[in-house]
C-alpha cells in the first residue's frame, strides 16, 4: 500500500489536498502542452477532484475541448519539482496566451530546459525529476462537489489568508 502526503489543514477543509502538484496535459487538437497548478482534493481511493478557474487556466481549456470531443484528457501531476517550475507554472492568461509553454519560463529561470519523461499508464509526459508523479485522466461530462466527503462548504486555505468556498464544478 502506498500513501500520498495530502494534508487537511483546517477543520473546514473540503478534504485532504495534494499541494503544489504540477498538472501537465496536451491539447487534443493542437498538440500544444501546458503545466499549471490546481486545487487537487482527494475524493476517493482512485479519484481526485481538480478545480479549473473558469476561463483562466490553460489546462481547463484543454479539458473543455476534450469534453467537446467526448474524450478523456490524459494528465500527469508531478509533485516535488524544482521551484523554478512552480514559478513558471503560475504564468497564466492574460500574461501568457493559450498555447504558450510555461515550462520555457522555468527553463529560462534555470538556464536549462525542463526534462520530461513518458508516463507509464497514460499517453502523456511528466516532469522527469519530480519526487513522484500521479497519472490519470480528466473525465468528460462529470463534475463533483469539492466538499462531497466533508460537507463543510469550504475548499482550502488560499495563500492570501482566506478560505474560499468549495466548488460544485470540480472535474474528476
Which residues fall in each region the model found?
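Extended, highly charged
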Residues: 1-172
Amino acid at each position: 500500500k502506498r500513501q500520498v502526503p495530502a494534508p487537511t489543514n483546517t477543520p473546514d477543509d473540503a478534504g485532504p489536498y495534494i499541494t503544489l502538484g504540477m498538472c501537465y496535459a496536451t491539447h487534443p487538437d493542437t498538440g500544444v502542452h501546458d503545466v499549471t497548478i490546481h486545487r487537487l482534493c482527494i475524493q476517493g481511493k482512485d479519484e481526485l477532484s481538480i478545480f479549473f478557474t473558469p476561463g483562466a487556466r490553460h489546462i481547463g481549456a484543454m479539458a473543455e475541448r476534450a469534453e467537446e470531443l467526448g474524450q478523456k484528457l490524459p494528465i500527469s501531476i508531478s509533485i516535488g519539482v524544482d521551484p523554478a517550475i512552480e514559478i513558471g507554472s503560475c504564468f497564466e492568461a492574460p500574461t501568457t496566451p493559450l498555447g504558450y509553454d510555461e515550462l520555457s519560463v522555468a527553463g529560462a529561470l534555470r538556464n536549462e530546459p525542463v526534462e520530461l519523461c513518458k508516463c507509464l499508464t497514460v499517453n502523456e509526459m511528466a516532469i522527469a525529476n519530480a519526487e513522484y508523479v500521479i497519472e490519470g485522466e480528466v473525465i468528460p461530462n462529470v463534475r463533483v462537489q469539492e466538499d462531497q466527503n466533508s460537507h463543510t462548504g469550504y475548499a482550502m486555505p488560499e495563500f492570501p489568508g482566506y478560505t474560499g468556498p468549495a466548488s460544485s464544478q470540480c472535474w474528476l
